[in-house]
């Protein structure tokens, strides 16, 4: 009876729309009191021990780097480059939109930042070029989510922290699935807009755009190349990303003043003030659950009812798709990764592969009502009705579900670069 109250408390607090820190705080305190030694103050001790990790520094640093680039000129330069490359192709501007989102996601590491930075520039351009509003909205909302799986990805960092999985390997594993999703979106964009042609090939324009956008293109190469050649760790790569973005936007592009940089740092600091307490409580709960062998007991119970990896994958995918509709991706990873991970591992699913599957499921949640974050952001910045935005994403939701199934049941898509 005591154990059964814990999920009831969590669900009740979510129904009452309490902040995540309240939900996790109450759940953790109850768990320590009911199942531990009764000393609730041990939460602080366990949280401190669990949070004493260098890798946690990568989260604020990657967020800061993404915010700097979204306020600078990298987004516009990447868009210009993609437009120059796709001009002679039917549906060229649609292709440029998706490629710009993918490229900026590889620079910023954030889906919402990608939607804001690329969407504000490309949505008017698509409408003025005669593209259907439904396609423009859907393409930007869906392609904006690519930042969730393309490295450097904050959700992948969170998964790595909560499951003790190599973040560098997660970054590399995200490349294959990101390419699959991007390819599927491009195929749809071309077939949907085959009649549109924006212009002819202009080598001078391409070279000029490449020169202007080269610094943005170099960043993911430097970050991932540095990690996998051993020059720096995942944490150090985040610091490199911040320094690189400041140098490029301030001294090379000269599109960011010091006052603007101060504003960006201040805004990022406020965001982290709400993020880190939640993360520390989640880590404390993770320590407690591991000590009490809750994941191990859950695995033992489910192993008697799940007889093969296919059943496990289908069940986990379905569960995570539902969760993605109701809970934001960070909260879902903090709460569920330590619980679902051991279940997947017990069925022979690689931890790296499962991390990609989990993030892709929750990525789809960005496009599903009632709490789809990209839907809400698009409604605000594009001044459209919520259900208009929702309907525009339906074709892309189907595309992303196809991509999810391919990645789930063909592990080589995630693991071939690592292996």
Question: Language-model segments: which ranges?
Answer:
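Alpha-helical transmembrane segments of multi-pass membrane transport proteins
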Residues: 1-419
């Amino acid at each position: 009876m005591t154990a059964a109250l814990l999920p009831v408390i969590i669900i009740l607090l979510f129904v009452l729309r309490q902040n995540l820190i309240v939900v996790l705080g109450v759940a953790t305190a109850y768990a320590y009191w009911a199942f531990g030694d009764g000393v609730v103050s041990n939460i602080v001790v366990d949280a401190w021990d669990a949070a004493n990790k260098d890798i946690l520094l990568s989260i604020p640093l990657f967020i800061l780097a993404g915010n700097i680039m979204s306020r600078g000129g990298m987004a516009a330069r990447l868009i210009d480059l993609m437009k120059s490359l796709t001009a002679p192709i039917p549906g060229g501007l649609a292709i440029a939109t998706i490629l710009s989102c993918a490229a900026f996601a590889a620079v910023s590491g954030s889906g919402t930042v990608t939607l804001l930075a690329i969407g504000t520039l490309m949505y008017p351009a698509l409408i003025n070029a005669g593209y259907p509003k439904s396609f423009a909205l859907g393409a930007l909302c869906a392609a904006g989510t690519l930042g969730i799986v393309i490295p450097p990805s904050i959700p992948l960092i969170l998964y790595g922290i909560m499951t003790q999985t190599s973040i560098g390997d997660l970054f590399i594993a995200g490349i294959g699935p990101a390419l699959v999703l991007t390819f599927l979106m491009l195929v749809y964009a071309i077939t949907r807009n085959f009649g549109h042609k924006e212009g002819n090939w202009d080598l001078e324009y391409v070279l000029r755009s490449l020169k202007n956008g080269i610094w943005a293109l170099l960043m993911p190469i430097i970050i991932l190349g540095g990690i996998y050649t051993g020059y720096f760790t995942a944490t150090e790569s985040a610091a490199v990303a911040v320094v690189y973005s400041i140098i490029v936007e301030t001294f090379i592009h000269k599109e960011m003043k010091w006052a603007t940089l101060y504003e960006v740092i201040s805004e990022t600091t406020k965001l982290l003030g709400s993020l880190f307490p939640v993360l520390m409580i989640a880590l404390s709960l993770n320590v407690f659950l591991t000590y009490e062998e809750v994941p191990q007991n859950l695995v033992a119970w489910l192993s008697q009812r799940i007889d093969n990896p296919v059943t496990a994958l289908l069940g986990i995918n379905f569960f995570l798709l539902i969760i993605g509709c109701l809970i934001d991706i960070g909260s879902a990873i903090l709460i569920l990764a330590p619980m679902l991970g051991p279940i997947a591992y017990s069925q022979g699913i690689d931890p790296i592969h499962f991390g990609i599957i989990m993030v892709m499921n929750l990525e789809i949640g960005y496009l599903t009502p009632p709490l789809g974050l990209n839907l809400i952001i698009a409604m605000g910045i594009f001044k459209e009705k919520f259900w208009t935005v929702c309907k525009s994403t339906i074709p892309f939701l189907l595309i992303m579900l196809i991509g999810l199934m391919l990645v789930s049941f063909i592990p080589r898509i995630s693991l071939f670069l690592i292996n």
